[in-house]
């Protein structure tokens, strides 16, 4: 408990061990690592903790969930098992954006915007490491299935929409949770893909032979293959800088994509979807973005979401990116250095719990700007952000107290005997997917 409070109230820690210097952490630094090592945490424990505090959506008829994967670079942890090649942005031009480490999949609730509260908040629900022999998107599908089939959580019967980036638009992920009738998946599609309209048979055709499922091709990069849209709306939005944009949203219903046959057959012709295109224009009528936004909307109840809901739901997906950035910079989400994979996973669970505690304290935090921040527009609007709550959390802990019992000294540990030599840990190989064995000369 005190470790979670220390994470929530110390935004200046540069390493995990510095959390023991936080006033609310009354134990020794060795206890910090012992707590992480001995921690036992069920996968759905965090979701059950925050479930009583989740409010019902008021402005939209569905609960919005987000799923994404973020890297944990560990290129120097040579004794850490199951390291693989992962994505990592690289600022040096010409270098490949990869490094060595782990990947973690997070599922979170994307709540509606509250008055006086920053729009970047999320509510983390599940976090799990994607092993090198697993598909990281299908790990997210398993997490989503865990949420929806848990009767103690409010997601099993309510209409839920999940949003994901382009990696979640592949057939394997879209097919994974179609047995949940209350789930609608919104995923971005690459602009080079080709989909198909449903085939409409004529009365003159024979019914003999294999049924025809796919009609004419619909190429996202070829406008000549697109028929007239089934639905079109125009919405207006204003940026933070005050610029006004006009967004034209079109939809083609009952589209199909081809499935896969390996490693197992995916009958995607059974799951028609709506294809949504969003094009953004500035005040002069010129294109504000070079390329249009293409979205796939699949699910039995997809027609209960209008085009405006779909467009704004996908844009809220970027709050997950804000969470990962804040977690790694202010909560040391990727800062725990250990050769034990289980302890690393425990630390990720602890940081997700700490962020959830910051979210629950958002309404009792005071706005405490620094002297040079008092005249900033963001401070004048008094929108409580995760950084402001973390800056104020020490006062909250001192005011309401902590349920943790005060520590009691138990004597001095004998420690290691003089002359003890520890066996060096074996070095682990870096696992590379699809690595072909070397051919004999």
Segments from the language model and where they lie:
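Contiguous, well-ordered alpha-helical segments that form the cores/surfaces of helical PPI scaffolds
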Residues: 2-6, 106-108, 351-355
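Gly/serine-rich nucleotide phosphate-binding loop at the start of the catalytic core
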Residues: 1-39, 45, 50
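Active-site-proximal, Lys/Arg-enriched surface segment
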Residues: 35-119, 124-127, 264
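A generic secondary-structure signal
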Residues: 22, 52-53, 146-151
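Short, flexible loop/turn elements at secondary-structure junctions
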Residues: 23, 68-71, 111, 166-168, ...
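Single, function-defining residue in the core of a domain
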Residues: 12, 78, 116-441
């Amino acid at each position: 408990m005190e470790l979670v409070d220390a994470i929530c109230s110390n935004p200046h820690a540069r390493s995990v061990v510095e959390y023991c210097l936080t006033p609310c952490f009354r134990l020794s630094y060795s206890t910090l690592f012992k707590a992480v090592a001995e921690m036992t945490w069920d996968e759905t424990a965090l979701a059950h903790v925050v479930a009583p505090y989740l409010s019902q959506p008021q402005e939209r008829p569905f609960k919005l969930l987000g799923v994404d994967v973020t890297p944990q670079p560990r290129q120097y942890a040579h004794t850490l098992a199951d390291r693989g090649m992962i994505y990592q942005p690289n600022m040096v031009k010409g270098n490949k954006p990869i490094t060595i480490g782990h990947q973690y999949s997070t599922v979170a609730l994307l709540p509606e915007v509250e008055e006086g509260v920053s729009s970047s908040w999320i509510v983390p629900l599940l976090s799990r490491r994607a092993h090198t022999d697993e598909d990281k998107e299908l790990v997210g599908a398993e997490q989503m299935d865990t949420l929806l089939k848990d009767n103690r959580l409010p997601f099993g019967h309510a209409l839920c929409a999940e949003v994901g980036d382009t990696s979640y638009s592949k057939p394997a992920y879209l097919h994974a949770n179609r047995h949940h009738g209350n789930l609608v998946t919104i995923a971005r599609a690459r602009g080079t893909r080709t989909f198909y309209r449903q085939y409409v048979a004529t009365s003159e055709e024979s019914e003999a032979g294999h049924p025809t499922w796919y009609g004419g091709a619909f190429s996202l990069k070829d406008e000549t293959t697109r028929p007239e849209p089934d639905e079109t709306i125009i919405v207006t939005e204003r940026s933070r800088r005050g610029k006004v944009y006009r967004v034209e949203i079109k939809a083609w219903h009952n589209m199909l994509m081809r499935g896969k046959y390996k490693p197992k057959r995916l009958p995607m012709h059974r799951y028609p979807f709506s294809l949504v295109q969003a094009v953004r224009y500035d005040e002069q009528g010129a294109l504000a973005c070079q390329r249009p936004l293409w979205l796939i909307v699949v699910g039995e109840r997809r027609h209960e979401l209008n085009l405006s809901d779909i467009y704004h739901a996908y844009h809220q997906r970027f709050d997950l990116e804000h969470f990962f950035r804040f977690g790694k910079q202010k909560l040391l989400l990727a800062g725990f250095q250990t050769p034990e994979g289980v302890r690393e996973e425990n630390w990720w669970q602890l940081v997700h719990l700490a962020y959830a505690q910051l979210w629950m304290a958002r309404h009792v935090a005071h706005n405490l700007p620094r002297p040079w921040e008092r005249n900033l527009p963001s401070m004048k609007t008094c929108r409580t952000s995760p950084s402001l709550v973390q800056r104020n959390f020490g006062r909250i802990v001192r005011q309401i107290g902590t349920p943790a019992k005060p520590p009691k000294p138990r004597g001095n540990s004998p420690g290691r005997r003089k002359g003890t030599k520890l066996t060096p840990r074996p070095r682990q190989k870096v696992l590379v997917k699809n690595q072909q064995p070397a051919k004999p000369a």
